[in-house]
Amino acid sequence: MGQKVNPIGFRTGVMVGWKSRWYASKQEFSGLLPEDKKIRDFIKRHPKKTQYRQAGIDKIEVERTRDEVKVVLHCARPGLIIGKKGQEIEFLQGELQNLIGRRVNLKIQEISRPELQAQLVAEEIAEQLAKRASFRRTMKRAMEQTMEAGAKGIKVQLAGRLGGAEMARREKQISGSIPLSTLRAKIDWGFAEAMTAQGHIGVQVWVNQGFYAMGDDKDGDDAEEGKASKKPARTYKR
């Protein structure tokens, strides 16, 4: 029976690059890896700046050199993080430096089409469910917007006490094609939780953004070079 592996993890290192890009010795690795998680959690769940949660942060990439830590935020509304004359981004950069005790170089990269990012779609659905919107209508609207934005397919799955029902259940809707086992397919995945009065509702979203072009793969460039040579054509002597 086929198992539902995480589409991003399945393609990482083959078609998709890593979100943390650095090298460390065995002694340093155990300290640096939790540091990356601390950076991501601090930005996404900032104790004071609630507007960061509205900025539509899709992913946070971390690169390390000997001198500094480079943090790249991919978000839909960069103005909420940059602030007036760049004051907010300087403040956040200072907070991150105090948090990890290293020099931080913070960069913001705007997402051109947030409707195609599965994490942002999942967070939008969760936000609507928390406002007690109809779950079926919310799913349908989100799927229509994603397909209109140019997606090849989308799948949305909700799990929990849907509509305030006494018994938790799972409901899913699919539009278009979602080839999860095809590595060339650009499948994005996102997860969010809706905090409702009846309990938590889990939201999972899969978005098919098309196929990777031949030069798009980040870490699979040498896969063709390492391929075994084909056997010579067999000849028959009379």
Range-by-range predicted roles:
Residues 1-238:
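RNA-contacting regions in translation and RNA-metabolism proteins
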